[in-house]
Regions:
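Basic DNA-binding region of bZIP-type proteins
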Residues: 153-169
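Residues immediately within or flanking Cys/His clusters that coordinate Zn2+
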Residues: 126-131, 147, 152, 158
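Hydrophobic alpha-helical segments
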Residues: 18, 33, 144, 165-170
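Short helix-coil boundary/hinge micro-motifs
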Residues: 1-128, 132-135, 139
Length: 170
């Protein structure tokens, strides 16, 4: 599941957050200190961790849509992001960016990352693996942007083997 290079820029934060839950094993690494530290949630309360999990699953739903799944009718993503104040900053070189008012806020950092990725066209390339028992987030670097699995060696191979066996049965 982790054979790909990390997503570029702020998308790496989103990829890391989505991948804190391993659907196959059921392990939620938000229950561990290292994963919380990587996301800036070291001293997070139970409510903040619940919000992080809600954010994670809302982002996973969007990544699945990026991969070609039908849109989910409603996720709390808009509501979560609306609570993340951002400010426009202009660097000395004249470049502008949206930055979190509170850089310690995970939701604000995610909102800024989404805004930057949407502006540079990379947001739709953050996808979730098509395999139902995986849904691992990955950045699609394929030229056509039509990658379907987090790993051709694991999830892609399993899907192709299932398709082959199904075709042989008919």
């Amino acid at each position: 599941m982790a054979e790909r290079a990390p997503a570029p820029g702020g998308l790496a934060l989103i990829e890391t957050l989505v991948n804190t839950l391993d659907l196959e094993s059921g392990v939620d690494s938000l229950d561990t200190d290292p994963a919380r530290a990587a996301l800036g949630l070291v001293d997070a309360s139970a409510a903040e961790l619940a919000d992080a999990r809600e954010l994670r699953e809302s982002l996973r739903a969007v990544c699945l849509v990026h991969g070609g799944h039908p849109p989910v009718p409603a996720t709390p993503l808009d509501r979560l992001l609306a609570a993340a104040p951002l400010v426009v900053t202009v660097d000395p070189d004249g470049s502008a960016a949206l930055r979190p008012v509170d850089p310690g806020s995970l939701v604000a950092r995610v909102a800024a990352a989404i805004a930057a990725a949407a502006a540079d066209g990379t947001w739709p390339r953050l996808k979730a693996c098509e395999a139902a028992d995986c849904h691992w987030a990955y950045y699609d670097r394929s030229p056509a942007g039509r990658s379907r699995w987090c790993s051709m060696a694991v999830c892609g191979s399993r899907a192709k083997m299932r398709a082959y066996r199904a075709a042989r049965r008919t």
